[in-house]
Amino acid sequence: MPATIAVTHLGCEKNRIDTEHMLGLLAQAGYQIDSDEDKAEYVLVNTCSFIGPARTESVRTLVNLAEQGKKIIIAGCLPQMFRDELLKEIPEAVAIVGTGDYHRIVEVVERSRTGERVSLVSATPTYIADEHLPRYRTTTEAVAYLKIAEGCDYRCAFCIIPHLRGDQRSRPIESIVAEAKQLASEGVKELILISQISTNYGLDLYGKPRLADLLRALGEVDIPWVRVHYAYPTGLTDELLTAVEQTANVLPYFDVPLQHSHPEVLRAMNRPWQADLNTRLLERIRERLPEATLRTTLIVGFPGESEAHFAHLCAFVERSEFDHVGVFAYSREENTAAANLEGQIPEAIKKRRRRDLMRLQQTISQRRNASQVGRVVPVLIEQENTQKKVWLGRSARFSPEIDGQVIVCGGAALNQLIPVRITAATPYDLCGEVFQA
């Protein structure tokens, strides 16, 4: 009789897709999937190990399950970095699976059921799933993430992604479009393209970046919203901006992780080319696409970051008027160049700088959101709050999980795009009412 398996997903949306493929494969093989860990014979945990706090959450989850005596299958980034340590410290782990091996999850479970303790971790991940691999989506019905490439060829000083995910490997345009059509047939209204560096999509496969060509091809798919995450500054070329302009279903939403503004800090981060580009890039986007939404992520407390460097970053944020900003305190990670740099910043200073920068951005976000008041915009309805008699959704300026939401009054329907008049704004969210023409 097939075993019952509970699955826990931790970490980023790239990890989520891997989890969804494992769920699809297990279900196809006849295994029972249950959200209740108490009823499951096995618990599969897809872990994150990108930065310290994520690793702590993964370890805490594993320890809690071990204390309950569960048979644990550990997948994802944590085994990729700490295979031997996990096998030694968590005897309840009946199997571990690396980031390049999740497509063999059925084999792993079957071998573990015979009593074998399975360790399947490729030293260098090379696998990437395509449209033929089964997938069981865990997002709302109308939203799907689509991985266009895996891995990264860059070596930023603070980042361990190349160790966790390997070098970049892109999927063919035809494969991505085929999966997008599958998702459209399932009722998906918003498709979110993800990879480590989306603007480098195709470089390894075609000899040059081809994100613009991919977007044009996806313009022929019946999905109203196509959103791109993880754009690299140098990849936002005129050709790409033109593709966004000319492709009706591609949202002018630019998620561009800049990390810092000061040339000295960027040089230490191994991103020296970026400093002169930042301001000109933002100006060019807004000139071409006045309705563009701009999101970035920044790191404070990087080794050697002085108060002058931090002041430069604050001035840059104030001048740039981003719609959304995520701020991370630098996390010192083994196997990165930054771990060995002099001038490591005390935790208290990192926390203070993060707090100060977030407070600065709150004022800007309030102003940017307030500019939406009075407009009628499409909102994707994702949830109903029956107690408060409101709907929760997102306009095109909000990406799931990382940005805000729109609180909607009036008659709406789940998983549909509804016209909403925006009536109020906070630093993070909007309020509105269903618009009757």
UniProtKB/Swiss-Prot annotation:
GO cellular component, one term: cytosol
Residues involved in [4Fe-4S] cluster 2 binding: C152, C156, C159
Cofactors (names): [4Fe-4S] cluster
Reactions it catalyzes: L-aspartate(89)-[ribosomal protein uS12]-hydrogen + (sulfur carrier)-SH + AH2 + 2 S-adenosyl-L-methionine = 3-methylsulfanyl-L-aspartate(89)-[ribosomal protein uS12]-hydrogen + (sulfur carrier)-H + 5'-deoxyadenosine + L-methionine + A + S-adenosyl-L-homocysteine + 2 H(+)
Binding site for [4Fe-4S] cluster 1: C12, C48, C77
MF terms in GO: 4 iron, 4 sulfur cluster binding; aspartic acid methylthiotransferase activity; metal ion binding; protein methylthiotransferase activity
InterPro entries with a match to the protein in the record: Elp3/MiaA/NifB-like_rSAM (IPR006638), Methylthiotransferase (IPR005839), Methylthiotransferase_CS (IPR020612), Methylthiotransferase_N (IPR013848), Methylthiotransferase_N_sf (IPR038135), NA-bd_OB-fold (IPR012340), Ribosomal_uS12_MeSTrfase_RimO (IPR005840), rSAM (IPR007197)
Domain MTTase N-terminal: 3-114
PROSITE patterns per UniProt: MTTASE_N (PS51449), MTTASE_RADICAL (PS01278), RADICAL_SAM (PS51918), TRAM (PS50926)
Family under the similarity heading: Belongs to the methylthiotransferase family. RimO subfamily.
Protein name from the UniProt record: Ribosomal protein uS12 methylthiotransferase RimO
Protein's gene: rimO
